[in-house]
Each structure stands twice: as structure tokens, then as C-alpha cells.
């Protein structure tokens, strides 16, 4: 993994699908990257985990969401939002915009309604 992963438009992109990892490899990369990010000023992370070829939800997506649900990383993560919930009118989208009013400036169209991503807001975030 490169020392400084991709960051575009105020959002750090963590691609967990790259090189078709196993679930364990993806979780390890997720853990390692979050540890690295805790040492930076990065505030928002777009986690690309895919949504599974069957359309039901991939194993990496499910594993990452389980990690976030149980908040095993509460020392780093403030909140997270499923890509499929990032749509105007959805409660999660409204909550995200209320807590982070400038987030609209960095969300891209490919993120809105995308079940293959999860948006993570780091605990120290003041966007």
C-alpha cells in the first residue's frame, strides 16, 4: 500500500476492492489505513467495498459494515453513512448535511445512492 493513499476533493478514497482481496485482507487494509489516517488531517473517507456481483451485498461490504456497526474503532470514527442512503430525502443524508453543512461541497455524484461505498467521518472532523 502506498504511504499516502488517494485523496481527492477533501475526501480520502480507500479502495478495498483493488487486487480482489479476501475479506480478511480487506479488513487488514481497512484497519491499517485507519491507523495511518489517525496521524493525518484527513477528515472524510470514502471506503469502496463493492456491493457483490449478485447484487445482495458483497462479503467485504458486509464485513466492513459490521466493523462499523459494532464501533470497534470509536477512537477514530465519528460516524458513517451507507452509500445507498446518501440521497436527498433520506434521513441519513439529511443527518450528514446537518452535522457537516459543508459536506455537499465534497460529495460527488458517483457517491450518491451508491451501495458499493460507505462514507466514514473521522472523529476529529470539523468540515
Task: Enumerate the predicted regions with their spans.
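Long, charged, low-complexity intrinsically disordered regions
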Residues: 1-127
Amino acid at each position: 500500500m502506498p504511504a499516502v493513499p488517494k485523496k481527492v476533493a477533501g475526501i480520502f478514497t480507500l479502495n478495498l476492492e483493488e487486487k480482489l482481496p479476501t475479506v480478511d485482507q480487506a479488513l487488514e487494509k481497512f484497519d491499517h489505513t485507519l491507523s495511518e489516517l489517525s496521524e493525518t488531517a484527513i477528515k472524510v473517507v470514502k471506503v469502496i467495498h463493492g456491493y457483490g456481483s449478485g447484487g445482495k451485498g458483497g462479503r467485504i461490504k458486509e464485513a466492513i459494515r459490521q466493523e462499523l456497526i459494532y464501533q470497534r474503532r470509536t477512537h477514530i470514527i465519528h460516524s458513517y453513512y451507507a452509500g445507498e442512503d446518501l440521497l436527498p430525502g433520506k434521513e441519513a443524508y439529511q443527518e450528514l448535511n446537518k452535522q457537516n453543512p459543508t459536506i455537499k461541497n465534497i460529495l460527488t455524484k458517483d457517491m450518491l445512492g451508491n451501495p458499493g461505498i460507505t462514507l466514514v467521518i473521522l472523529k476529529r472532523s470539523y468540515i
